């Protein structure tokens, strides 16, 4: 019995390690998910995260490897934005289907973030990888930079997809170039003002590759200003308008790997997962 109590105490210490003593209780969709009687959660913890894994599921079988990816995803986002870690943990949920996502958030998706509640929901299964870098960036950017201004959907999603960094086994830019060759480019003013009405794959990758260019060229500070104040084609970074920067970037963008017709067709059918 004594040995059993010692083991239990050790498990409690391990499960709570890495969290601040003043950690806030889950809120928003995280609190709703934890209170949903249709779901049984395995509770784990790694630095910066309280993790909830659907019991008897695909992610439950691979929970150690999934958890190991989370701290590096947060560090990656922090490095991109050049910020300190969040003071409070992110509540992150692993599930295995879009149907389960609909039950939890009311929408059919494979990844979802609620930055105001520091909540992330991720689908992963044998045919779909978890997009932890994408959704974690949503939370970290939202917490660090605040509420995004007008005409910034492209920046919000571009930053998140830039954090993920790839589509299938290719870079965002390589898939974008293949799509642009086949489907054409989305005009930048349209990306800026009508982002949510564009084809998801093309819009997300075009925004991601452009945001990646902006970060590398100007750093995060001007992007934070765009995020906060809102963006327009004549917004100025480094003495150039966004429109001029985008035109120059598009003309100079080059592929590092070429997709076959079959590889591009598979991505168009399945998506980046």
Residue ranges and their predicted role:
Residues 1-4:
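Positively charged n-region of N-terminal signal peptides that target proteins for export
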Residues 7-16:
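Bacterial N-terminal signal peptides
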Residues 9, 59, 93, 122, ...:
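Amphipathic, positively biased hydrophobic alpha-helical segments used for protein targeting
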Residues 18-23:
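Boundary at the C-terminal end of the N-terminal hydrophobic targeting segment
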Residues 24-29:
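Cleaved targeting-peptide boundary
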Residues 30-148, 152, 232-237:
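Juxtacatalytic substrate-recognition/specificity segment
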